[in-house]
Amino acid sequence: MGKDEEEMRGEIEERLINEEYKIWKKNTPFLYDLVITHALEWPSLTVEWLPDREEPSGKDYSVQKMILGTHTSESEPNYLMLAQVQLPLDDTESEARQYDDDRSEFGGFGCATGKVQIIQQINHDGEVNRARYMPQNPFIIATKTVNAEVYVFDYSKHPSKPPLDGACNPDLKLRGHSSEGYGLSWSKFKQGHLLSGSDDAQICLWDINATPKNKSLDAQQIFKAHEGVVEDVAWHLRHEYLFGSVGDDQYLLIWDLRSPSASKPVQSVVAHSMEVNCLAFNPFNEWVVATGSTDKTVKLFDLRKLSTALHTFDSHKEEVFQVGWNPKNETILASCCLGRRLMVWDLSRIDEEQTVEDAEDGPPELLFIHGGHTSKISDFSWNPCEDWVISSVAEDNILQIWQMAENIYHDEDDAPGEEPSKAS
């Protein structure tokens, strides 16, 4: 009986998800300026835009690259991948940025093929938990593997099609962890300085400029203070000696490399009531850091007074796994959760007055809910070149590249009552 009930519940949930998706699809033209949906062969647990952008002459699109990975079934090979994406130019005629009903795509060029192409596959041992490029040289990509080591690849030194023997040949293997994890962060100040956090409760720091032995490097420094899994690590974006970490022990820790003790963070706070899964420092305001948690909330903290949160965002209905600041707008933050939703927040709208009707959609700072995914979102990335464009990947193999409609974030001049409703 129990199994039948479980199956029925699963079927009902699937039906609800499909209904929600149909409603989302129908509303896409009103809520978005761009939606590209691409089915990958395997799910990717990671996505990150690369910083370069080209405009081919005579074309109505720009070309950018992004990093993806695979999470295949047991016997299938895994890859670190590079994809090339065509994005319509802003001044493209509106009929060219048309809505493609069959594919629920908005911002196509009258031709749906070839907008996302996998241009390079590099053999990888096991799934790619996370992949991030080095800011000073985007050819260099670090990956979190399932075997505790962190791999470093220079993708310019690898062929576009992987060797058929399936051999994984990273340019460097970074040692120091005893188990896998997800936390990974390159220093924007010190070329080659890489932080990693894992399930072994440790944070490792490497300098990849050091001389390797047999393509292997041991950690330059290991930081131990978390009591349990280190879920995420991040370098501060203004001070080269500061970084933060969060973990299953519910703590947010701030570390200072100038401190004499590697086991003592300079600041610590119990940030959430459950595991803390992610953190992100604000790129404009040196004091502000955001965290996301299994307790379904996103919180803002001020490094000058870490003991109490500045603000709590509590609209998510499931555990929050990723947070990320808009690289061009100081007050814009995005977060995604287990519940298939990616939310975009505007801090400048906190405590704004609302009508009763608007309040039903969520708090004033909840700017937008992206409802295009039908399973858990694994990762997302703000586009560094195209304002307000986000790419997101989910467990059902879907990669989406999207941009909310301009009138949603530029609505200061709207008459009362004309404010666009939030998507969901």
Curated annotation (Swiss-Prot):
SMART domains found in the cross-reference section: WD40 (SM00320)
Main location per the UniProt record: nucleus
Pfam families: CAF1C_H4-bd (PF12265), WD40 (PF00400)
Keyword annotations from UniProtKB, A to Z: Chaperone, Chromatin regulator, Developmental protein, Differentiation, DNA damage, DNA repair, DNA replication, Flowering, Nucleus, Repeat, Repressor, Transcription, Transcription regulation, WD repeat
Subunit structure: Binds directly to helix 1 of the histone fold of histone H4, a region that is not accessible when H4 is in chromatin. Component of the chromatin assembly factor 1 (CAF-1) complex, composed of FAS1, FAS2 and MSI1. Component of the FIS complex which includes at least MEA, FIE, MIS1 and possibly FIS2. Interacts with EMF1.
Function according to Swiss-Prot or TrEMBL: Core histone-binding subunit that may target chromatin assembly factors, chromatin remodeling factors and histone deacetylases to their histone substrates in a manner that is regulated by nucleosomal DNA. Component of several complexes which regulate chromatin metabolism.
Protein family per UniProt: Belongs to the WD repeat RBAP46/RBAP48/MSI1 family.
Protein name: Histone-binding protein MSI1
Gene name for this UniProt entry: MSI1
